[in-house]
Amino acid sequence: MLYFFQQQGDKIHRLEKMESGCWIHVTPPFNEAELEKITERLGIPMDFLTDSLDIDERARYELEDDIKLIVINTPILNESVTSEPTLYITVPIGVILTPDHVVT
């Protein structure tokens, strides 16, 4: 699913469609057609959008043309039903910066 947000004054408002300067937030369930729409319209490499879906992805920074990818690992509560003693696990989060948009 795609959500679009833009700052107006000191508040962030949800938009109905993509506009220049907006934040694009991509959440499950992922639709291949929506991802392709973003890559084509913004010129983002598809792997920039999909790399953070890999639970084993490492934190890193990449630059391709004028598009930046930042992958960070953030802790979340381990909700696994196994008897694993680890209270927290880390999951990757991708942040893509283009000249006109932020994509998460």
Protein language model annotation of sequence segments:
Residues M1-T104:
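Peripheral, non-transmembrane regulatory/ligand-interaction domains of membrane transport proteins
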